[in-house]
């Protein structure tokens, strides 16, 4: 609990406040009525933790409108890394979806991504097309030290399959992936950087 107000930007906090997330075992989504942002409703699910990828001061998009009309909401369960037990989530990394017509979470839809990734989570997500999403995966669970996001996997909504991408350089030499995904003719392109050569797609 903070004894004084302080911080800046997303790190700002008020006196007597528990900084950062107050509800680690819930995900809250605001749905705005139009582009003026004057009216909105908030919907909540307790199936996943908050839907935001984190890397230091960077926040990454986790909500994507797919061709089937649903908004898929991914949570990497980053709150597992919090030092204060009151801010740690007990929920695994997973995905839920929002019915855009009802403007509510689809109560029947939930997929445990962490279970299919041997306990690992993900740093980023991108929408490809159809029911396909690309995930930048960590190499080990948050409970272990030295976890690094150096693998890619494709999640297919509908069949709920998580498939790791093969044919990439060894994870020992991958130093990063591009920020932007390019999709053309059903194929997704992303830059990969290695420690022993120039970036490649």
Residue ranges and their predicted role:
Residues 1-66:
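Long, acidic/polar, low-complexity amphipathic helices and coiled-coil-like
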Residues 73-146:
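Long, well-ordered mid-to-C-terminal structural blocks that present hydrophobic/aromatic surfaces
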Residues 1-4, 56-71, 77-80, 119-132, ...:
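Structural signature of eukaryotic scaffold interfaces centered on beta-propeller domains
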Residues 25-28, 46-100:
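Membrane-embedded hairpin module used as a gating/binding unit in multi-pass transport
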Residues 9-38, 86-103, 148-160, 200-201:
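Beta-propeller blade signature
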Residues 162-201:
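C-terminal structured domain segments
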Residues 25, 67, 91, 129, ...:
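Short loop/turn segments that connect beta-strands within the blades of beta-propeller domains
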Residues 36-59, 101-122, 158, 163-175:
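Surface-exposed loop and turn segments in beta-propeller and other repeat-based domains
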